Amino acid sequence: MQIPKIIHQIWIGYQDPPEWCTRFGEEMQAMHPGWEYKLWKHDDIFNGIYKDDPFLKEYITNPEVYKWAFMADRIRLLLLRDFGGIYVDLDAKPIRPFDVILNKLNDQHTFFAGMKDSQSNNTLIDCAVYGAARNSRIINECLEEYVDVKWAHGCKTFSEKIIKRFGMDVALFNYEYFYNWQLGENTIVLHDIVETRLFSWNDGNPNKKVW
């Protein structure tokens, strides 16, 4: 089950994305000829494909938890569950095509994500960039967590699932690919990391392979 050549980006909210985000999205699309590219905007989600999703309905109608980050966390999981492909934050500047990543995967890989080394020397997983085959095990397990922790999920739930279930179908890439602060020979995107979206990763499993 291979990860399809589809790039998903999202912009939710009632304002248009800033010019630089729009430009990065256009660069992403131009860099991937032959790929399907989709920028999902507010109406596409809330008045379209996921208008009946109970969690999104509650997020957007509950003033105490009206947070775009909660919504975005769920939306990107839903998109990869239903379509497969690669999710990339809209504020990520593309440097090299994601063909580089797909060429490193084998037929067993149904999910990939990237890590970032922190100043405290912990290894962290971020969710600004990740990819999955349609209806993948990891994505479905993350979505199942919403039943109990719909107000406290984010990338922590996402990261914990990867840690606990990391196996032959999961590929992890080191920080050079998605979360380097400067250009390097492996840089795929440059992204402004938000530390609150990062989580510790236990590297105690000798079977874990990291590029």
PLM regions: where:
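Small-residue hinge/turn detector
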Residues: 73-85
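Glycosyltransferase-associated regions of secretory-pathway enzymes
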Residues: 1-72, 88-211
